[in-house]
């Protein structure tokens, strides 16, 4: 997601107050960084608990699809499915995209946790997909519930960890930040730009990439790609300034086929 218009407009100016809060939070966040373990490319258990797989490798149990113009639970054109044990976003039954964006929501909300997803882009974008959506998916974190989505709503209010695949030439980072209906404090100020780029490498072709995100409630988030820190920010909030302490997890269907080998969560101490 990037290049599309914001869906919600800010209803209240945040300004100096949250910027100062971000500065005051800095020392706490720094202390947590020192205590946090480095992300593991492999592994199941840590001192804080056990990685839990959100995807069982067989079907969509625990997940609910929602497409623009369709009720929650309707898997439009069988877009989300399991293929050879991989959670797949497929467009082989589509002829034209027509802006029917979709999301697949996990059943449980989370607050303080790490999420680790192994993903890749495959095939070609479906006809009619927007240019910015080519080789584009996302982990929608701290999101609204699928039940609260309106029938024609494009995207859930959430913090999006934008997953991008590289093109033939040029740089195209992944694990970026996009903010549908939200803002964050970035570089000690409330940043209202819709998308912010990470400092990751570019990943071309159909190679598998591991994206891990450390989420600490309303305090802040950190993105890692293949174990390397890609970006960090604080105080995730709705457009009206309400801090987001917890929310749903969903993946996207934005017009390009995508596969997930695994999606795991490790809940961490507050």
Kindly give the residue locations of the regions a language model identified.
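Bacterial N-terminal signal peptides that target proteins for export
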Residues: 2-16
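Carbohydrate-interacting regions of secretory-pathway proteins
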Residues: 28-270
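Bacterial N-terminal signal peptides
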Residues: 15-26
């Amino acid at each position: 997601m990037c290049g599309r218009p914001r869906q919600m407009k800010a209803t209240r100016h945040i300004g100096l107050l949250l910027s100062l809060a971000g500065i005051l939070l800095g020392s706490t966040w720094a202390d947590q960084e020192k205590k946090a373990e480095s992300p593991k490319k492999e592994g199941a258990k840590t001192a804080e608990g056990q990685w839990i797989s959100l995807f069982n490798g067989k079907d969509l149990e625990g997940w609910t699809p929602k497409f623009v113009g369709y009720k929650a639970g309707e898997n439009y054109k069988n877009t989300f499915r399991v293929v050879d044990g991989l959670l797949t976003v497929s467009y082989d039954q589509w002829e034209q995209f027509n802006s029917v964006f979709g999301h697949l929501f996990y059943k449980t909300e989370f607050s303080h946790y790490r999420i680790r997803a192994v993903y890749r882009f495959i095939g070609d974008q479906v006809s009619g997909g927007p240019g910015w959506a080519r080789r584009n998916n996302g982990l929608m974190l701290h999101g609204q519930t699928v039940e609260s989505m309106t029938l024609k709503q494009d995207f859930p209010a959430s913090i999006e960890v934008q997953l991008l695949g590289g093109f033939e030439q040029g740089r195209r980072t992944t694990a970026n930040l996009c903010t549908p209906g939200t803002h964050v404090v970035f570089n000690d100020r409330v940043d209202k730009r819709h998308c912010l780029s990470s400092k990751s490498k570019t990943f071309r072709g159909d190679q598998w990439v591991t994206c891990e995100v450390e989420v600490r409630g309303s305090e802040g988030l950190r993105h890692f790609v293949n174990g390397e820190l890609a970006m960090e920010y604080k105080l995730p909030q709705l457009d009206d300034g309400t801090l987001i302490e917890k929310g749903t997890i969903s993946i996207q269907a934005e017009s390009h086929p995508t596969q997930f080998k695994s999606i795991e969560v490790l809940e961490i101490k507050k």
